[in-house]
């Protein structure tokens, strides 16, 4: 019996025409990294039997509202979960900084997306214990941070993952490491599998 209850919507980072979305030396491009990770994820998820869609597959930026409309318009009987993949930055892309780590954003308030993001957060932290994980509250009780980012505000559950800082030299090296990128994909898959099981047991019955 197919217990794939999720429709995964992959949302790549900003297009190649958005300025500042790269490392200060220009050797790392967020739009390329994100699209490559999304392609790997889509292939693995398809093999596992998931329904997979993209908000955009082009290199240029379609606009945040168009991304949201694309996700809103996907017809499915499954529970829609949008995952937006980005790299973080402490500046505008012109200088190196020391800020580091991982953040996950969801829409404001207590929602089902918070539960899903906490599950993903826990999986990533388990698989990458040496990384700094940034909490949404000073007491570390809230894993995700709240934001009214356009892509988080549709008719679906959603999380935006800021994976490492593209203006931190050490983390840029990690973003270029194929082994680390593959491990990141595998960790995301495990997180999605856990979320899917939760949806199957609690939301689809």
Residue ranges and their predicted role:
Residues 1-68, 98-100:
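Active-site histidine-acidic residue metal-binding/catalytic motifs
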Residues 7-11, 51-56, 79-85, 103-106, ...:
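Structural recognition of the beta-strand scaffold that forms the well-ordered cores
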Residues 9, 22, 28, 84, ...:
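Active-site-adjacent mobile loop/cap segments within catalytic or ligand-binding domains
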Residues 15-17, 58-62, 87-93, 109-112, ...:
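Solvent-exposed loop/turn segments at secondary-structure junctions
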Residues 17-29, 89-119, 123:
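A short, glycine/acidic-enriched catalytic loop
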Residues 38, 42, 65-68, 113-121, ...:
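Extracytoplasmic/secreted envelope proteins and their assembly/folding machinery
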Residues 64-79, 148-154:
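Mature extracellular/periplasmic domains of secretome proteins
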Residues 112-141:
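Active-site-adjacent substrate-binding region
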């Amino acid at each position: 019996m197919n217990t794939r209850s999720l429709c995964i919507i992959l949302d790549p980072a900003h297009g190649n025409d958005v300025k500042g979305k790269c490392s200060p030396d220009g050797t790392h491009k967020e739009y390329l990294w994100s699209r490559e990770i999304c392609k790997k994820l889509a292939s693995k998820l398809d093999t596992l039997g998931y329904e997979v869609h993209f908000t955009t597959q082009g290199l240029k930026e379609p606009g945040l509202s168009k991304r949201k409309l694309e996700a809103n318009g996907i017809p499915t009987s499954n529970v829609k979960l949008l995952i937006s993949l980005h790299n973080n930055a402490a500046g505008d892309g012109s200088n190196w900084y020391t800020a580091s780590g991982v953040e996950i954003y969801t829409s404001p308030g207590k929602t089902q997306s918070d539960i899903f993001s906490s599950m993903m957060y826990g999986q990533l932290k388990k698989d990458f214990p040496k990384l700094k994980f940034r909490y949404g509250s000073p007491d570390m009780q809230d894993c995700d941070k709240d934001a009214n980012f356009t892509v988080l505000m549709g008719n679906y559950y959603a999380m935006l993952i800021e994976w490492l800082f593209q203006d931190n030299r050490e983390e840029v090296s990690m973003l270029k490491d194929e082994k680390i990128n593959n491990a990141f994909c595998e960790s995301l898959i495990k997180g999605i599998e856990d979320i899917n099981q939760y949806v199957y047991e609690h939301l689809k019955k």
